[in-house]
Amino acid sequence: MAKKRVVVLYGGRADEHSISCISTAGVLGAMDTERFEPIPVGITKDGKWIINGEDPRGWNLDGGELPTVKITPESRPVMLDPSRGQDGFFIGEPSHINSADSGFGTSFVSMPDPEMHHALTSLGHVDAVLPVLHGPYGEDGTVQGLLEMMGVPYVGCGVFASAACMDKHYTKVVLGAAGIPTAPGVTVDARNFTAADVLAKIEDAGLTYPLFIKPSRAGSSFGVTKVEKADDRETQQDRLAAAIATAGEHDWKVLVEQGIDGREIECAVLCPKAGDEPEASWPGEIVLDHQNDDQFYDFDSKYMDASASHVEVPANLPVSVLEDVRDVARRAFKAVDGAGLSRVDTFVTPDGTVMVNEINTMPGFTPISMYPKAWDATGVSYTELITRLIEGVLR
């Protein structure tokens, strides 16, 4: 039987570019190459799609450096012709990558002119796409919409779920309509705000401190600030303004959320074929190993400091609470019309209440990521996980 040819997209224009690269190294290392022929296609930070760049299989975080998709002398541009569907992937010449006069430009995707097809080589028939892209321009429905338009099967959530879950404000709206609790908060426009008005909104909403201020459409803890209660209003406004400015560097839409007195418990959801009943893993917990009052799970704790935390699956909670988390995760996945995979992050309060923090529709696949670790602890190996996800969209 011929191997199914799978384009693996990685990199991208988002802040999470390097995390996508590390996730892809894990995915390619675990993919069953007896069944699938992976075709790695990198996306540079400025949006160029390339093939034959640096081999992502060799990337890791051991050296403390974050990898990026870079154009090499061997790189060739990948161009798309949406009208040709699964046969619409083409390779240009190396000189086309940076040549504005070539007609290929530097856009996110180009539709080659028929007269230019002679300068292109077909990438061949593509059976499916596995977009290992985190954050905007990859996990937010944009790439999913492109693949839908082309009629190319792809792994993961569709346009609506991807867009709704990328935007934490609208995640709250959808889950609230489904009766699923989330952390209380207010939304601020970082382009046009005064700290006094924000403080008034916080007080009107009855939010208690500490607060977590974060971009609405970013991941991997980029731009997140913990804000404690100050002794006076002027200091409080200064702290809020600084935190909103930090979040605003990543997104103009900013969430101000009440800190929850509870444990952060994550659950992996798997639904290879859209419409099937979703499965939930044993929930896990990121345990922080540097104990201090100000620590929270920021970007450096996640990726740059291996000694900062470790993963425990299942989390050290009563089985009844773990089952509640699994139930909430499945319900949340259904509420957003999820497909393929997601990681549902929850808070579990001391009284056992489970509320959703966020839904990641393309969770990290790095060696330290919760999603593959949770499924491995539930009895699904890394390789089996990827196989099921790909075969689900080929059925």
From Swiss-Prot:
One of its GO terms (molecular function) is ATP binding. The keyword Protease does not apply. Keywords: ATP-binding, Cell shape, Cell wall biogenesis/degradation, Cytoplasm, Ligase, Magnesium, Manganese, Metal-binding, Nucleotide-binding, Peptidoglycan synthesis. It catalyses: 2 D-alanine + ATP = D-alanyl-D-alanine + ADP + phosphate + H(+). ATP binds at residues 204-266. Its main location: cytoplasm. Mg(2+) 2 binds at residues 358, 360. One of its GO terms (biological process) is regulation of cell shape. Its cofactor is Mg(2+); Mn(2+). It is an enzyme of class 6 (ligase). Residues 172-391 form the ATP-grasp domain. Its EC number is 6.3.2.4. Binds 2 magnesium or manganese ions per subunit. Pathway: Cell wall biogenesis; peptidoglycan biosynthesis. Mg(2+) 1 binds at residues 345, 358. It comes from the Bacteria. Cell wall formation. Belongs to the D-alanine--D-alanine ligase family. This is D-alanine--D-alanine ligase. It comes from Bifidobacterium longum subsp. infantis (strain ATCC 15697 / DSM 20088 / JCM 1222 / NCTC 11817 / S12). The gene is ddl.
